[in-house]
Regions:
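Catalytic pocket-lining loop regions of alpha/beta-barrel enzymes
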Residues: 76-174
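N-terminal cationic-hydrophobic initiation segments that often serve targeting/anchoring roles
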Residues: 5, 27-31, 56, 113-114, ...
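Active-site gating/metal-coordination segments in enzymes
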Residues: 11-12, 19-95, 143, 147
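Divalent metal-coordination and catalytic microenvironments
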Residues: 5, 13, 23, 36, ...
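Active-site-proximal loop/turn and secondary-structure-junction residues that shape catalytic pockets
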Residues: 19, 42, 68-70, 100-102, ...
Length: 214
């Protein structure tokens, strides 16, 4: 992964994986290249909360990753609340996979954002592959200052421009979802979205650097 990052001029990557120890090892080996976020399954209850606290304190992880599709929950389910509470207490952003029914729909993520307005939420894939969900991600995020959009896997280049111009120029992040998606493909989609160079620089790196205080 580091070799591919070098090939495409990527300075740092925000990474997560179902097995947090894999990310621990990557961050330990390449502390200047990787920023870890903790994969958390809300069904694990107190164990999940303890994992988040440990990864932040012992391994300098900087956020929480929730995957409603893989772990079979909806973001607006109360089972998620203990993790959101620790996110609020520790000022951790929460990255949430979006786009796949019935578990990962944008409206359920927005409902969670309404319940926890002090927690910064990143809607990963900004609705993903369905135009209806992509538009919902944009339209709903406009109304909630604590919601940010990440671009990986979202196929409509014009929606990156729309999100940047309507949701906010500090609230859209480029992402790769590597190794599932190719760095260059994800880059090209953003490059051709019709925004000026200064805006592309915000999306590609300035916004996430500011967001995570890197």
């Amino acid at each position: 992964m580091v070799a591919e990052m070098d090939r495409y001029g990527i300075e740092k990557s925000v990474v997560s994986y179902m097995d947090n120890t894999v990310v621990e090892q990557a961050v330990k080996r390449f502390p200047d290249r990787f920023v870890g976020i903790t994969w958390a399954n809300p069904y694990e209850g107190d164990k999940a909360v303890e994992t988040v606290v440990r990864e932040v304190r012992e391994h300098c992880f900087q956020g929480i990753k929730l995957h409603p599709l893989l772990n079979a929950f909806t973001a607006n389910d109360a089972v998620v609340h203990p993790l959101m509470e620790v996110a609020q207490q520790m000022d951790l952003p929460v990255f949430i996979h979006s786009g796949h029914p019935p578990f990962s729909l944008p409206h359920s993520i927005i409902q969670l954002a309404e319940d926890f307005p002090k927690v910064r939420i990143v809607m990963v894939h900004m609705g993903h592959g369905n135009g209806i969900y992509i538009q919902a991600a944009i339209d709903l995020s406009k109304k909630h200052d604590n919601v940010y959009l990440e671009t990986s896997g979202m196929p409509m280049h014009t929606k990156i421009r729309e999100a940047y111009n309507t949701v906010g120029n500090e609230r859209v992040f480029w992402g790769s979802d590597a190794p599932f998606h190719h760095y260059r493909v994800e880059m090209l989609r953003t490059e051709v979205c019709g925004l000026p160079e200064s805006a592309l620089e915000n999306i590609f790196y300035r916004n996430i650097k500011r967001f995570l205080a890197l």
